[in-house]
């Protein structure tokens, strides 16, 4: 066997590998008794729905505000264009 392969298969390395696997396996087990019953958990869907309702209301307000601002700017532009057509002496 090659020296590098022999050092990988040494009893010390194998023991360390087995201990690491055992510790990782023990940590991955779920804790017993820590489950929260469904009745006492917050309704995630309800909270998400309320959040989306508020976000939609905010978007509607923003859209209305932008629409009103656009209308104002268009009226100002039309007024400027109309006033530019009239001679200053009239």
Curated annotation (Swiss-Prot):
Q: Where is the signal peptide?
A: 1-28
Task: Please provide the record's keywords in A-Z order.
Answer: Cytoplasm, RNA-binding, Secreted, Signal
* Top-level taxon in the UniProt lineage: Eukaryota
Functional description taken from the UniProt entry: mRNA-binding protein which interacts with a range of target mRNAs including SERPINE1, ACTA2, CCN2 and COL4A1 and may promote extracellular matrix production. Binds to the 3'-UTR of SERPINE1 mRNA and stabilizes the mRNA, possibly by competing for binding with SERBP1 and preventing SERBP1-mediated mRNA degradation. Also binds to the 3'-UTR of ACTA2. Testis-derived lumicrine factor that triggers epididymal differentiation and sperm maturation.
**Oligomer status and interactors:** Interacts with NELL2; triggers epididymal differentiation. Interacts with cell surface receptor TFRC; the interaction mediates uptake of NICOL1 into fibroblasts.
Against Pfam families, the record matches this protein to: Neuropep_like (PF15161)
Q: What else is known?
A: Up-regulated in kidney and serum in an experimental model of chronic kidney disease (CKD) and enhances renal fibrosis so may have promise as a biomarker of renal fibrosis and as a therapeutic agent for CKD.
Expression by tissue, per the entry, reads:
Expression is enriched in both male and female reproductive organs, including the testis, epididymis, seminal vesicles, coagulating glands, ovary and uterus, and in various non-reproductive organs such as brain, thymus and liver. In testis, expressed in both germ cells and Sertoli cells. Also expressed at low levels in the kidney. Expressed during neocortex and cerebellum development.
Instruction: Report the main location listed first in the record.
Output: secreted
What terms describe the molecular function in GO for this protein? mRNA 3'-UTR binding; transferrin receptor binding
Similarity section: Belongs to the NICOL family.
- Name the PANTHER family for this protein: NEUROPEPTIDE-LIKE PROTEIN C4ORF48
Keyword flag Signal: yes
Q: Where found in the cell?
A: Secreted; Cytoplasm, Perinuclear region
Does Nucleotidyltransferase show up as a keyword for this record? no
Q: What happens when the gene is disrupted?
A: Deficient males are sterile, whereas females are fertile. Deficient mice display defective sperm migration from the uterus into the oviduct and poor sperm binding to the egg zona pellucida. Mice are infertile because of deficient epididymal differentiation and deficient sperm maturation. Suppression of renal fibrosis in chronic kidney disease models.
What gene name does this entry carry?
Nicol1
Instruction: List the protein's name.
Output: NELL2-interacting cell ontogeny regulator 1
Q: State the GO CC annotations.
A: extracellular space; perinuclear region of cytoplasm
Q: Which GO terms describe its biological process?
A: 3'-UTR-mediated mRNA stabilization; spermatogenesis
């Amino acid at each position: 066997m090659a020296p590098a392969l022999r050092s990988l298969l040494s009893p010390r390395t194998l023991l360390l590998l087995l201990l690491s696997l055992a510790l990782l396996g023990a940590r991955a087990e779920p804790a017993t008794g820590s489950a929260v019953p469904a009745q006492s958990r917050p309704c995630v869907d309800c909270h998400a729905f309320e959040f989306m309702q508020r976000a939609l209301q905010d978007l509607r307000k923003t859209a209305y505000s932008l629409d009103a601002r656009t209308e104002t700017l268009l009226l100002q532009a039309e007024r400027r264009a109309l006033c530019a057509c009239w001679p200053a002496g009239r």
